Regions:
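Non-catalytic, usually N-terminal nucleic-acid engagement modules in DNA/RNA processing proteins
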Residues: 1-150
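Glycine-rich phosphate/ribose-binding loops and adjacent secondary-structure elements
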Residues: 148-169
Length: 169
């Protein structure tokens, strides 16, 4: 398992892997799914945010476009390493409502260190053909993002499932 230990260089500092990225909602005024332990770990230097939620929150998005800094606005350290998931898939509607370009624009505006590409999750309940289609579309969106991206952060392609068994397969 030592092969998983690496050091990633990000715009806001070095990151030793493996690493925990708790959802900290630094891009969201509420804390409905921020784990309680995030306040108990004084040196927790990572956070995961949802780029789509930030972009859809018009007052906040306008402030960021006007030059506000997300880390400062939300009261976290400037050295916090932020992973910004695209957030493009809405589980309630099961629709994709963003593009790789819009997602990258948002992720770069909030100065994300690690940027996740737009993806649609896989599921054991789906037929293999449907999951294969989703994987292919995710790959194409990742390639579009890669071809469009010229920033300093790390662009990670996202393909995932609902559970560990789906991910392993």
């Amino acid at each position: 398992m030592l092969y998983r230990r690496q050091t990633l260089s990000t715009p806001h500092g070095a990151l030793e892997t493996p690493v925990l990225f708790p959802v900290r909602n630094i891009g969201k005024r509420s804390s409905d799914n921020t784990p309680e332990y995030t306040d108990e770990i004084p040196d927790l230097s990572t956070a995961m945010v949802n780029a789509r939620s930030i972009r859809q929150r018009e007052p906040q998005w306008n402030r960021i476009q006007g030059g506000e800094n997300l880390r400062g606005e939300m009261g976290v350290s400037q050295s916090t390493i932020v992973f910004a998931d695209s957030g493009g898939f809405d589980f309630r509607s099961e629709e994709l409502d963003t593009t790789p370009e819009k997602s990258l624009e948002t992720q770069q505006a909030i100065e994300a260190d690690i940027l996740g590409t737009v993806d649609v999750p896989l599921s054991r309940e789906n037929r293999e053909r449907e999951n294969d289609r989703r994987v292919e579309e995710n790959v194409q969106r990742a390639l579009t993002a890669s071809n469009s991206y010229d920033g300093d952060g790390l662009l990670f392609a996202s393909v995932h499932g609902y559970d560990p068994e789906t991910i392993r397969n």
